[in-house]
């Protein structure tokens, strides 16, 4: 065999990620780990070291995670581990396993020497706190959260990891017997492991950025607010979710704990006995006890997201809005997709994506009432009025459907994100604040032509999929991906998305409450992409007009009489506009909040995984 043939075979070996990592065997607190090195071209040069499946913690069912005890010999870190136990998409079975707390690392390497002191980006996945994994969705071994493109294009270390989800990650009795937040504590353990060990991989332990999307973005926000992470995190990026999101904190965990306990045959009157029983129940039974009907639900879908973080007096010691002093020195970048609410609107108002089915005023009014229960009839009416102002001039179905999506986007994503940005800015000491809107239209061919960027549409661009799978994307998609990776990794390096090794298409100015600066990210990013005060009219409505209305329902409990109830919409033209209900049968119900309201009908409506 000739020398050229030998060389070719050797290069092919490395391109298949079968060569030993350039770092060699790396010593961690648990023992030695050895990954693989993947060459980025046949001619050699740059490469990436990849370590998959490194254990960072262990955990028993419904208990806090503990440090992993370590291993003997050298761990071959070459394959992703199974995700944490969760329901399948059909919710009639489970997959994954309880032994799931593993992380993955991508380290870019140059031609001559191994990397050192690189910024570190730690990814937290979304999935409604119900599903997901550190590697993400898989299509022909092409994993969504493969960190290679970010690492090599941005010259940063990328870390992803698993954390517990669903009842196993967030079931809580609301007291010390079962405090919950196990999934958040898993995340913290991964961040702390990175802090202690990443220097051995060439990373800078004093320059860690956590970033995430949806439930992962809310997790990022909550991690910056938790006193447990003091000194661990330098910067944070929240994509479509914050700690102040209406779906990020469960205010009534005991109700849902009792509901699950009843389903699996555990006592419910005493939380200590209930917790003890739940901890020894088959984890698969606990997981499958939570189920969601994805149609014909009585309330907006977010009301059914039961197993999510709680204020436990410890890891999350207070209402998140009171914890922003803890993030005063953490640079923060946050934003939303311009039609983030579309995914949820398709569940709440199924006609949204159906060309031959109309959205009616009644549909929208009922949706609004479900989201404005706390302010009763006046809140529902005021909200309905401001969002439907354009309908008189443009009663087209396109305009009406876009209004529904805009409303869900505002209340679930934009308003809480703007609140979080303002809180961060108000409490920041040395930290900087940046805001964005992602508006590159969805590539889903089944969506209406008016569709913008749906929930999670940004993920493929942040993780460089237009480069990893070029045949599936257009040149404009690669332009968007290149810009997002550049801004994100520059921010991780310096706290400024403009400053770093990667050139950017235009200068991104910091956010303040006075200027309302945000960068509009799409295929054409120019100086005109820097804009101010996103949807200012609606922000003012929610912050001023809506907030000034008297609260008639506290803590999501039902109204006591019809005068306070959220109304149902008109049913014919003679009514002219939405009117309040005239009897109990017309009142829009609110989700149950305590055991007195529990029953078979409630359990039949109980949700499972969707969206966030």
UniProtKB/Swiss-Prot annotation:
Residues at the active site: 214, 340, 455
UniProt keyword Repeat, yes or no: yes
Disulfide bonds: 84-100, 266-277
Extent of the signal sequence: 1-20
GO terms of molecular function: acetylesterase activity; glycosphingolipid binding; lysophospholipase activity; protein-containing complex binding; retinyl-palmitate esterase activity; sterol ester esterase activity; triacylglycerol lipase activity
Residue ranges with Polar residues bias: 583-599
Residues carrying covalently attached carbohydrate according to the record: 207
Entry EC number(s): 3.1.1.13, 3.1.1.3, 3.1.1.6
Chief location: secreted
Pfam entry (one): COesterase
Annotated control of activity: Activated by bile salts such as sodium taurocholate.
Role this protein plays: Catalyzes the hydrolysis of a wide range of substrates including cholesteryl esters, phospholipids, lysophospholipids, di- and tri-acylglycerols, and fatty acid esters of hydroxy fatty acids (FAHFA). Preferentially hydrolyzes FAHFAs with the ester bond further away from the carboxylate. Unsaturated FAHFAs are hydrolyzed more quickly than saturated FAHFAs. Has an essential role in the complete digestion of dietary lipids and their intestinal absorption, along with the absorption of fat-soluble vitamins.
Family: Belongs to the type-B carboxylesterase/lipase family.
Name the record gives this protein: Bile salt-activated lipase
Gene: Cel
């Amino acid at each position: 065999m000739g020398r050229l043939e030998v060389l070719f075979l050797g290069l092919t070996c490395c391109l298949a990620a079968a060569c030993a990592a350039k770092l060699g065997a790396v010593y961690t607190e648990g023992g030695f780990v050895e990954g693989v090195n993947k060459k980025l071209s046949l001619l050699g040069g740059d490469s990436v070291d990849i370590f998959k499946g490194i254990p960072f913690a262990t955990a028993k069912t419904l208990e806090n995670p503990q440090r992993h005890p370590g291993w003997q010999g050298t761990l071959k870190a070459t394959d992703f581990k199974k995700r944490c136990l969760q329901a399948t998409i059909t919710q009639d079975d489970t997959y994954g396993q309880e032994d799931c707390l593993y992380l993955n690392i991508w380290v870019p390497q140059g031609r001559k020497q191994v990397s050192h002191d690189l910024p570190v980006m730690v990814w937290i996945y979304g999935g409604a706190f119900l599903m997901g994994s550190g590697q993400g969705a898989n299509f022909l071994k092409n994993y969504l959260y493969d960190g290679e493109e970010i690492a090599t294009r941005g010259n940063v270390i990328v870390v992803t990891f698993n954390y517990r989800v669903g009842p196993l990650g967030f079931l809580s009795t609301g007291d010390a017997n079962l405090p919950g937040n196990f999934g958040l504590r898993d995340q913290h353990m991964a961040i702390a492991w990175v802090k202690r060990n990443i220097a051995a991989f060439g990373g800078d332990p004093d320059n860690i950025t956590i970033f995430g999307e949806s439930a992962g973005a809310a997790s990022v926000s909550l991690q910056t607010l938790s006193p447990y992470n003091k000194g661990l995190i330098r910067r944070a990026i929240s994509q479509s979710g914050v700690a102040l999101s209406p779906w990020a904190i469960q205010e009534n965990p005991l109700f849902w704990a009792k509901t699950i306990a009843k389903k699996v045959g555990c006592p419910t009157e005493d939380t200590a006995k209930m917790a003890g029983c739940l901890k020894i129940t088959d984890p698969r039974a606990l997981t499958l006890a939570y189920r969601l009907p994805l149609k014909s639900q009585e309330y907006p879908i977010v009301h059914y997201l039961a197993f999510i973080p709680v204020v436990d007096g410890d890891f999350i010691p207070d209402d998140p809005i009171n914890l922003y002093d803890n993030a005063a020195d953490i640079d923060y970048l946050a934003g939303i997709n311009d039609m983030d609410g579309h995914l949820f609107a398709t569940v709440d108002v199924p006609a949204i994506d159906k060309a031959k089915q109309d959205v009616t005023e009644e549909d929208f009014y009922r949706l609004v009432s479900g989201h404005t229960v706390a302010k009763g009839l006046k809140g529902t009416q005021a909200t309905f009025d401001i969002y439907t102002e354009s309908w008189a001039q443009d009663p087209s179905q396109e305009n009406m459907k876009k209004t529904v999506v805009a409303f869900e986007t505002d209340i679930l994503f934009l308003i809480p994100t703007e609140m979080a940005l303002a809180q961060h800015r108000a409490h920041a000491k040395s930290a900087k604040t940046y805001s964005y809107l992602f508006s590159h239209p969805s590539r889903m061919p089944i969506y209406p032509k008016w569709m913008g960027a749906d929930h999670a549409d940004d993920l493929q661009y942040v993780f460089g999929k237009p480069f990893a799978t070029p045949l599936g994307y257009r040149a404009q998609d690669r332009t968007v991906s290149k810009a997002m990776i550049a801004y994100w990794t520059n921010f991780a390096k310096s706290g400024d998305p403009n400053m770093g090794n990667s050139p950017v298409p235009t200068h991104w100015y910091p956010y303040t409450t006075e200027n309302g600066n945000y960068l509009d990210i799409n295929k054409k990013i120019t100086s005109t992409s820097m804009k101010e005060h996103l949807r200012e009219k609606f922000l003012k409505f929610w912050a001023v007009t809506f907030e000034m209305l008297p609260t008639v329902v506290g803590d999501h409990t039902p109204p006591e009489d019809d005068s306070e109830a959220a109304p149902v919409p008109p049913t014919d033209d003679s009514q002219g506009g939405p009117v309040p209900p005239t009897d109990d049968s017309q009142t829009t119900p609110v989700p149950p909040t305590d055991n007195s309201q529990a029953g078979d009908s409630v359990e039949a409506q109980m949700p499972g995984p969707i969206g966030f």
